[in-house]
Amino acid sequence: MNHKVGFVSLGCPKALVDSERIITQLKAQGYELVPTYEDAGVVVINTCGFIDSAVQESLDTIKEAMAENGRVIVTGCLGAKADVIKNACPDVLHISGAHAYEEVVNAVHQHLPPPADPFTQLIPPQGIKLTPRHYAYLKISEGCNQKCTFCIIPTMRGKLQSYPMAQILTEAKKLKQAGVKELLVISQDTSAYGVDTRYQQIEWQGKTVNTRFYDLCEQLGELGIWVRLHYVYPYPHVDDIVPLMRDGLILPYLDIPLQHANSRILKAMKRPASSENTLLRIASWREICPDITLRSTFIVGFPGETEEEFSELLAFLKEAQLDRVGCFKYSPVEGAKANDLDNPVSEDIKEERYHRFMQVQAEISRNKLKNKIGSTQTVLIDEITEDQIIARSKSDAPEIDGLVYLPKISGITVGSFAEAMITDSDDYDLYGDLEYSLA
């Protein structure tokens, strides 16, 4: 019997972690993963349904798999809208929502029974990872308690459920032992970690720690590898983490989605509504940890956004001088409360504002990177091509930030650290020469 499974993972890093967990279970039960539809006995697709373009990509992928294989199991965020999937592809075998690991595995069992002798001994202790060996995503919770009007994540993934502290720290230790040099801490609301447990106390390696964001960062910092924080909602207690960055326990890097700067728009989004307070906090973080890299994301073209309100966002951007910025044009998501707001912004204006926003940020980024010329940066080697080395500094998260390009020399391996002298820069990337390897 064919025990081969095709697997497609779409969407964000949080979905990638879900895929890793499902794949680990399937591999432990003896299934073989194959890269093509035609060789698979069944195909599993982990979908994204956050915005319209993601929904369309998911549906297109399902249709492609149905056309080339015909035996398809669908899971992930779009699975929460089973009717949408059924209308487009009525013959899919099974549909489940996000983080439904056991349900997906059981569906595979039903339509493709597992081998009699699973090869559990072949599964590494850290599980199967879909990232390069030297970095890994560490998911610390599921769901979100926020009520942002542009978002439907709580509908798809439920309320906040923090994973047990000991489970997270054990996974982190296994990843380090497997050679991982960088942990990317992710969730829907990273800084809310532990709220749902009322900061339950646990015993960990002979000491008492609380199930809360600060304690988790502190314990991860003791591993002695890069720890990078993503999706950090700007709660007041986030300020407490910055000294850990200054002291070198975790990377001086904070991914903190701010979404906008105008108070009326922020209130309509149901987000913290004080850009003045945000600017004061940014100044405080930089005073405590001068090397901190601040990344954020913003939405332009939110319903009702006026030219004056957009100009206020640009003014905030210029004053905040954020290091890394992403921007999204508002996209109405089925089920989001923001869809009911008056005065939707036209697509032409959204596009025009997006480009103006990115032009402002490109200049900020260009000037910030120019200031790094002549400095020495610790870099992590991501890739070695025929003619160059591609690396990242402490300021660069994989896939979403810039890169450091270096001339190829012998004795350097992927996943190793090195010191690089920066000699040039552009809008988003750095260029330099290797000084020496840190192994």
From Swiss-Prot:
What does the UniProt entry say about where the protein is found? Cytoplasm
GO MF, one term, reads: 4 iron, 4 sulfur cluster binding
SUPFAM superfamilies found in the cross-reference section:
Radical SAM enzymes
Q: Kindly state which keywords UniProt assigns to this record, in alphabetical order.
A: 4Fe-4S, Cytoplasm, Iron, Iron-sulfur, Metal-binding, S-adenosyl-L-methionine, Transferase
The TRAM domain, residue ranges: 370-436
Q: Recorded E.C. number(s)? A: 2.8.4.4
Outline the extent of the MTTase N-terminal domain.
Answer: 3-113
- A Gene Ontology BP annotation from the UniProt entry: tRNA modification
Cofactors needed by this protein, per the record, are: [4Fe-4S] cluster
Residue ranges annotated for the Radical SAM core domain, each copy included = 130-367
Q: Where do the annotations place [4Fe-4S] cluster 1 binding?
A: C12, C48, C77
GO cellular component, as recorded: cytosol
Reactions catalysed? L-aspartate(89)-[ribosomal protein uS12]-hydrogen + (sulfur carrier)-SH + AH2 + 2 S-adenosyl-L-methionine = 3-methylsulfanyl-L-aspartate(89)-[ribosomal protein uS12]-hydrogen + (sulfur carrier)-H + 5'-deoxyadenosine + L-methionine + A + S-adenosyl-L-homocysteine + 2 H(+)
> Which InterPro entries does the UniProt record give?
Elp3/MiaA/NifB-like_rSAM, Methylthiotransferase, Methylthiotransferase_CS, Methylthiotransferase_N, Methylthiotransferase_N_sf, NA-bd_OB-fold, Ribosomal_uS12_MeSTrfase_RimO, rSAM
UniProt binding sites for [4Fe-4S] cluster 2: C144, C148, C151
Give me the comment on cofactor binding: Binds 2 [4Fe-4S] clusters. One cluster is coordinated with 3 cysteines and an exchangeable S-adenosyl-L-methionine.
Please report which protein family the annotation says this sequence is part of. Answer: Belongs to the methylthiotransferase family. RimO subfamily.
- Protein function: Catalyzes the methylthiolation of an aspartic acid residue of ribosomal protein uS12.
Q: Which PANTHER family match?
A: RIBOSOMAL PROTEIN S12 METHYLTHIOTRANSFERASE RIMO, RIBOSOMAL PROTEIN US12 METHYLTHIOTRANSFERASE RIMO
NCBIfam families assigned to the protein according to its UniProt record, in alphabetical order: 30S ribosomal protein S12 methylthiotransferase RimO, MiaB/RimO family radical SAM methylthiotransferase
Q: What is this protein called?
A: Ribosomal protein uS12 methylthiotransferase RimO
Source species:
Legionella pneumophila (strain Paris)
- Name of encoding gene: rimO
